[in-house]
């Protein structure tokens, strides 16, 4: 698995997987995409972007900010999953938030390889 493929597996869900409401979305998607795994600590947070992978690849052609990250030109629909209670031992319980934010990524060879965060404007 390349770093770009790992980025897609951990962060891109387009179109958004249907039939999973609220917090259940995070638990199911993190397990399904093997972001969380049995016997391993829970990841404190993870963001899924509900936009085509090509849109995130295009972000790598935009100028980087002072810290080297590239931001999407327009806000995207995302689901932000955050661990409830801070206990990293399974079972992992997440809180889900639907947001419309710009996405910040780091790129390698023109492809996004790390989701650095999101911001409202």
From Swiss-Prot:
Disulfide bonds join 26-81, 42-92, 60-107. It comes from Gallus gallus (Chicken). GO terms for cellular component: extracellular region. Its EC number is 3.1.27.-. One of its GO terms (molecular function) is nucleic acid binding. This is Ribonuclease CL2. It is found in: Secreted. Its main location: secreted. Belongs to the pancreatic ribonuclease family. It comes from the Eukaryota. Substrate binds at residues 6, 9, 43-47, 82. It is an enzyme of class 3 (hydrolase). GO terms for biological process: defense response to Gram-positive bacterium. Coiled coil: none annotated. Pyrimidine-specific nuclease with preference for C. Keywords: Disulfide bond, Endonuclease, Hydrolase, Nuclease, Secreted. The active site is at 11 (proton acceptor), 114 (proton donor).
């Amino acid at each position: 698995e390349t770093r770009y493929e790992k980025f897609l597996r951990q962060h891109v869900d387009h179109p958004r997987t249907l039939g999973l409401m609220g917090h259940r979305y995070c638990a199911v998607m993190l397990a399904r995409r093997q972001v969380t795994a049995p016997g391993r600590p829970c990841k404190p947070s993870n963001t899924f972007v509900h936009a085509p992978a090509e849109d995130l690849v295009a972000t790598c052609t935009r100028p980087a900010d002072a810290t080297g990250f590239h931001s999407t030109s327009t806000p995207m629909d995302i689901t932000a999953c955050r661990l409830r209670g801070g206990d990293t031992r399974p079972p992992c319980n997440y809180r889900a938030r639907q947001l419309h934010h710009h996405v910040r990524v780091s790129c390698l060879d023109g492809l996004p390889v790390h989701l650095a965060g999101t911001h409202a404007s």
